Amino acid sequence: MNRAENLDSIPTDLILEIFSRMSTKSIGRCRCVSKLWKSMLGHPYFTELFLTRSSDHPRLLFGVKRERQWLFFSSPQPQDLYEKSSLVDFHMNFSDFHMNFSGDIRRNECTYVSGFIYFPRKRIKNYLCDFRVICNPITGQYAILQLITFHEKRSFLGFDPIDKQFKVLRMKYNDRGIVVHHILTLEPGKMRWRKIRCPLAHEPFWEEICANGVLYYLAEPTDGGSYVICCFDVRSEKFKFIDAKCFGDFSIQLINYKGKLGGISWKYDTVDGKRTVELYMWVLEDVEKQKWSKYVYPLPGNSYHYSVAGVTAKGDIVFVKTYTSKPFYVFYVNPEKKTFQRVEIHGNHEVFDTNNLVYAFVDHVEDLQFDVMKKTYAAKPISPPKQKPKPPSTETSSREDHQGWISISSRKYHQVRTIAHRQQGRRKFESINKFNALYLDDGDEDTVAHQQRDHHTFKSISKFKAQRLLDDDEFTGVKTSKCDTSHLQNRVTAVHELHIWSITVGKVSLASQVSIKPEADTDAILDKVIEYIKRHHVTIQVEKEQNP
């Protein structure tokens, strides 16, 4: 009996059981071995099996911000904290470095939902505009959902555990300055924003949490009433509201306390020259009657150097140090058992040698769903076309693998596309662009989406009128440093419309479509387009083709 026969004799269920005990990174590598393994490890049955297995071993997820980068780590969440004394040091190790996420990400605009990180407003490297981004911090995969429109106020990501669907709730101002609500379901095929009705006009705050299929966030009614907690049922897409005046003037962080909605805040004071810290916690005991329980716990005086990561399923409030250090500690406080535990986390990464911003999420479960989303929603990377033999090249790239082209018709319609290939060293399974193009509602005039004809991919097109773009010193809509603007007058008369097509991060792909007025100097305008792309993106090879 040869090896192939030995492998065939192993039951498939046993093979999947073995794979389910592996790490997410190892599974990603195994998917690259063969088409059979890719199909087997991407099957919904295995995805659910892996999630069930991971749920038995929740982890702490750490995000560390270093300059303009976010690095994600995870560590096993201790399960036997209370088998020893009330104050014990535990020593745990970080898992391998998972993700290096470039871009400008602000702390209060990064949320955690069912194993995924959502950035409602993220500045992508090399782009001076904001995007929505969802990522799996363990596999390093992420998807750019859409450009952010100018009038948008806030957006939240929610998860429906019954239908296993992610939805984005967006709030934006209409032409009358009133906040309107839209919902986007992340699913295969055509996706579009749907306008939904909210019975209470309100201004959303940053604090939010998604628990048991309900998205909670703090808000202030526009009529000037007391603060409320908006409860958005992700599945039914209906709103309910809870009075939040019990919080008073406290700055509240919403939490999931053993399946109940809760809020946490701090109070600092100085007594006899000593700094005191008190932890205030509210728990919603009765949703219908809106009955809250309030708890106050004294904490060590140096607790102001820590932040609340969340509450574990066992009721432990988790505190993490605000900045990286060696040693690095995590504290577990259990109000019911009146215990205070300290866990030392060992991280050998260089990021812990300096002070970098840290925040953490509790009960993190490694999930492969994003890989399945990749399989369902992924767009194949745009690749350069085959070179035509006749058209002459007017500019030559310093690198042969970067190509671009311009095609000129009798209507003076021009297209410029640049391709930047994947960075060397990235693993094959760390791909991006997981969703089909977003089709927007009629109220979104800033963005239009079209299906690419010659590829099974998509192009997300942001369409702007030239005058709007030229207000910011750059005909491409990108702000630049203040300088002599006399040259802009020619651009105003020359460029009629500019379409920016932008999809990728990692594999950067930019395509611009420019309509030029007949009286304009075609070559001069095209040279400016090429100059801009070369300056801000990649070196390209350009071909001009004149149609008869």
Swiss-Prot record:
Bias (Pro residues) ranges: 382-392
Residues passing through the membrane, by range: none
Cited InterPro entries: F-box-assoc_dom_typ3, F-box-assoc_interact_dom, F-box-like_dom_sf, F-box_dom
Sequence ranges assigned to domain F-box in this UniProt record: 4-53
SUPFAM superfamilies in the record: F-box domain
Classification via Pfam families: F-box (PF00646), FBA_3 (PF08268)
Protein name per UniProt: Putative F-box protein At1g33020
Source taxonomy: Eukaryota, Viridiplantae, Streptophyta, Embryophyta, Tracheophyta
